[in-house]
Regions:
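Conserved class I S-adenosyl-L-methionine
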Residues: 93-107
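Short helix/strand-capping turn motifs
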Residues: 36-38, 42
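Class I SAM-dependent methyltransferase Rossmann-like catalytic core
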Residues: 50-89
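Conserved SAM-binding loop of SAM-dependent methyltransferases across substrates and taxa
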Residues: 105-121
Length: 331
């Protein structure tokens, strides 16, 4: 049975192989499932126990547990969280560092493996999730991993409108699907970022969604073969055309972007439509409009095209091809 020291040593070690990282996360998942009683399930569908919120979908505890299996995503964010906490300790030397982890899921994956590296009293941790079942699981894990001496509280609530009583030094909010299409990452960021301490750290620091014309079938096939794709090289070779940055979500600007959004007939917020002119010098018959999501979790800890399951290129819904080669896209 894996312990927190062995787990965090493996996950934070840049020399760990992909197989070692995967094995460590699998062992963590198995222990968490055995203790908390929640088995990972990738069933992202209407019967999965998801919570339908006004600002998106809060996936079920079982689906959230399955996200641990996205190895690169989990490792990059865990390393980012550790680096952010160490940076916060340097900034707020009087301590303790206050952390709010929104959408923690049943395993608190991005933080729990790290807590054993800190002394009790160094951190004050607030865990927030819409599902009480997830919080019940985390509570069992805190006891099982021997973390009772740490200052950890659990709150059931919607991160889209949750109001924290203080200004945390670190906020972790990783509640996204590809291209931010379902889970409420945008609304969560817009609500929580203004509550951050002025010198605090928000994770992720930036999410960028690029609108491109791409040969998605070819790119996906190449990735499945094990090829490494370089977006800049694809663009230089004319195999992908970058049209625009559809969205750049920076925590400090999220609330303003939300205020500028309009409400559609269904009562949902929509960003302003984009109208783009298609390239005229290339044969575009084999290309399709697609969105690519890139994430800067913290400083050098980043996820780019095809490095993780949620940022694979996604076919663009809501694209309208208009006269003179223009595309109108509605977020």
């Amino acid at each position: 049975m894996i312990g927190l020291k062995q787990l965090s040593d493996t996950l934070l070690n840049e020399a760990s192989s992909l197989a070692q990282l995967r094995d460590a996360l699998n062992a963590f998942t198995q222990r968490c499932s055995d203790v908390g009683g929640i088995l990972p399930d990738r069933s992202f569908n209407a019967w999965a126990g998801d919570a339908l919120l006004k600002n998106g979908v809060a996936i079920s505890p079982a689906a959230a547990a399955h996200c641990v299996n996205d190895t690169q995503r989990s490792v990059v964010f865990i390393r980012a969280v550790y680096a952010a906490i160490k940076a916060a300790q340097a900034r707020f030397a009087q301590g303790p560092v206050e952390i709010l982890y929104a959408g923690c899921g049943p395993f608190a994956t991005l933080l729990l493996p790290l807590l054993g590296r800190f002394e009790a009293g160094e951190l004050t941790v607030h865990l927030l999730d819409i599902h009480q079942r997830s919080l019940d699981s985390v509570d069992l894990l805190i006891s099982d991993f021997g973390l009772q001496a740490h200052h950890i509280s659990c709150t059931q609530g919607d991160a889209c409108d949750y109001q924290h009583p203080s200004h945390p030094h670190v906020i972790i909010a990783e509640t996204m699907q590809k291209s931010l299409e379902q889970e409420p990452q945008f609304a969560v960021t817009a609500n929580l970022a203004p509550q951050l301490h002025p010198q605090g750290i928000f994770i992720p620091q930036q999410i960028e969604v690029d609108l491109c014309l791409a040969k998605l079938n070819e790119e996906t096939a190449a990735v499945k073969r094990g090829d490494t794709l370089d977006s800049d090289a694809l663009i230089a070779a004319g195999q992908r055309h970058r049209l625009a940055t559809a969205l750049c979500l920076i925590p400090a600007q999220a609330a303003t972007l939300q205020q500028q959004a309009s409400q559609n007939n269904a009562g949902l917020l929509e960003l302003n439509p984009m109208h783009l002119r298609m390239p005229t010098t290339a044969d575009l018959s084999d290309f399709e409009p697609a969105l690519f999501t890139r994430v800067q979790a913290f400083e050098q800890h980043q996820l780019i095209d095809y490095e993780w399951l949620m940022v694979h290129g996604s076919w663009l819904k809501g694209a309208r091809q208009g006269p003179r080669g223009r595309i109108g896209w509605f977020a």
